[in-house]
């Protein structure tokens, strides 16, 4: 029997080391077939990478993180080349270990008290008018990191009074009331929390999370701020069916959510959950039509769509695929 991994504070555990800590064994094995990517999943890289390197340098200089890099997002080159990024606060080490996600797991460091001001200054220097702030899960904090979110929102608005802020929050497991008390007092312009997939596969895809809890988080925020849009996103290709995705869309509408993103899951490494199917652009179009018919005001559905992909355009209702 192999010795258990000793988790050291501040150390990032990724790939095989991270997956070894998941009690539900669902990761890919050598014998499992890896599906070949269809033509529509091929990524075109920009010819000039100077803008990309500039954003990376600004992040490093200020000790900030982007979920684009930490989660190995396939849209990194496109978004960075257009001067946009999704900032990830509260460090780059997550207390969860979801087998679809490339963000490192471990025992995180104490939050950086200067991060809100550094974030606000970086956003000002980049000249952004719309920003998405997300975070790792911080189950080690009594409020799940909610106060840090609020501090970041306040600092950003002080430095950038005309900016719009979208927050992509964790589920605040066991801390919802306290977290919402804080966030409803300092609300963003868009409140986003991803369900990720369908309830049937939650035990494998989101160990430690609860489908009903996530729906309740979205509903409770909406009840506190009926005027602020709530948003959620799902990945396809993890064993669900299109019919199950549509059922989740109905659940989201019943809980007051009006903005939706649907995108294709891509396996970050051979140690992560395998892709079980590739959904065609036509199928995404069909699901978008279903979403609009249900009453979603915004629905970004396509192979490369991610929760924060062109979030500024999503918020304006401009079609994103």
UniProtKB/Swiss-Prot annotation:
Provide the catalytic activity annotation: [[Fe-S] cluster scaffold protein carrying a second [4Fe-4S](2+) cluster] + N(6)-octanoyl-L-lysyl-[protein] + 2 oxidized [2Fe-2S]-[ferredoxin] + 2 S-adenosyl-L-methionine + 4 H(+) = [[Fe-S] cluster scaffold protein] + N(6)-[(R)-dihydrolipoyl]-L-lysyl-[protein] + 4 Fe(3+) + 2 hydrogen sulfide + 2 5'-deoxyadenosine + 2 L-methionine + 2 reduced [2Fe-2S]-[ferredoxin]
Residue limits of the Radical SAM core domain? 80-297
Can you name one GO molecular function term for this protein? Answer: metal ion binding
Which GO CC annotations does the UniProt entry carry?
A: cytoplasm
Reported EC number(s) for this entry are 2.8.1.8
Q: Which SUPFAM superfamilies match?
A: Radical SAM enzymes
**Nuclease as UniProt keyword:** no
Q: Which cofactor does it need?
A: [4Fe-4S] cluster
- What pathway is this protein a component of? Protein modification; protein lipoylation via endogenous pathway; protein N(6)-(lipoyl)lysine from octanoyl-[acyl-carrier-protein]: step 2/2
* Record text on cofactor binding: Binds 2 [4Fe-4S] clusters per subunit. One cluster is coordinated with 3 cysteines and an exchangeable S-adenosyl-L-methionine.
The UniProt keywords, alphabetically, are:
4Fe-4S, Cytoplasm, Iron, Iron-sulfur, Metal-binding, S-adenosyl-L-methionine, Transferase
Question: Enzyme group, top EC level?
Answer: transferase
Residues reported to bind [4Fe-4S] cluster 1: 68, 73, 79, 308
Matching entries from InterPro entries are given as: Aldolase_TIM (IPR013785), Elp3/MiaA/NifB-like_rSAM (IPR006638), LIAS_N (IPR031691), Lipoyl_synth (IPR003698), rSAM (IPR007197)
Q: Which Gene3D superfamilies match?
A: Aldolase class I (3.20.20.70)
Give the location in the cell: Cytoplasm
Kindly list the positions annotated as binding [4Fe-4S] cluster 2: 94, 98, 101
Q: What family name appears in the similarity comment?
A: Belongs to the radical SAM superfamily. Lipoyl synthase family.
Q: Which NCBIfam families match?
A: lipA, PRK05481.1, PRK12928.1
- Please give the name of this protein: Lipoyl synthase
Q: Which organism is it from?
A: Pectobacterium carotovorum subsp. carotovorum (strain PC1)
Q: What is the gene called?
A: lipA
């Amino acid at each position: 029997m192999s010795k258990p991994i000793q988790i050291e504070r501040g150390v990032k555990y990724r790939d095989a080391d991270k997956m070894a800590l998941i009690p539900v064994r669902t990761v890919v094995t050598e014998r499992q077939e890896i599906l070949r990517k269809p033509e529509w999943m091929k990524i075109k890289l920009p010819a000039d990478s100077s803008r990309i390197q500039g954003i990376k340098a600004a992040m490093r200089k200020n000790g900030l993180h982007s979920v684009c890099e930490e989660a190995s997002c396939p849209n990194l080159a496109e978004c960075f080349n257009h001067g946009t990024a999704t900032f990830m606060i509260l460090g780059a080490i997550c207390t969860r270990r979801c087998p679809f996600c490339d963000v490192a797991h471990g025992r995180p460091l104490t939050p950086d008290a200067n991060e809100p001001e550094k974030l606000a200054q970086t956003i000002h220097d980049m000249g952004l008018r719309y920003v998405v702030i997300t975070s790792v899960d911080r189950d080690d904090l009594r409020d799940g990191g909610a106060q840090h979110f609020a501090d970041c929102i306040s600092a950003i608005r002080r430095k950038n009074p005309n900016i719009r802020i979208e927050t992509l929050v964790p589920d605040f497991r066991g801390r919802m009331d306290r977290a919402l008390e804080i966030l409803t007092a300092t609300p963003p312009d868009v409140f986003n929390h991803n369900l990720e997939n369908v309830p049937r596969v939650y035990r494998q895809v989101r160990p430690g999370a609860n489908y009903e809890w996530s729906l309740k988080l979205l509903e409770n925020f909406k009840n506190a701020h009926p005027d602020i849009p709530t948003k959620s996103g799902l990945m396809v290709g993890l064993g669900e069916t299109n019919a199950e995705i549509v059922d989740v869309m109905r659940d989201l509408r019943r809980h007051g959510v009006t903005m939706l993103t649907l995108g294709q899951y891509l396996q970050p490494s051979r140690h992560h959950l395998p892709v079980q199917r590739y959904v065609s652009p036509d199928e995404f179009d069909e699901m978008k039509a279903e979403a609009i018919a249900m009453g979603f005001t915004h629905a970004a559905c396509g192979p490369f769509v991610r929760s924060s992909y062109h979030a500024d355009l999503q918020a304006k209702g401009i079609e994103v695929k």
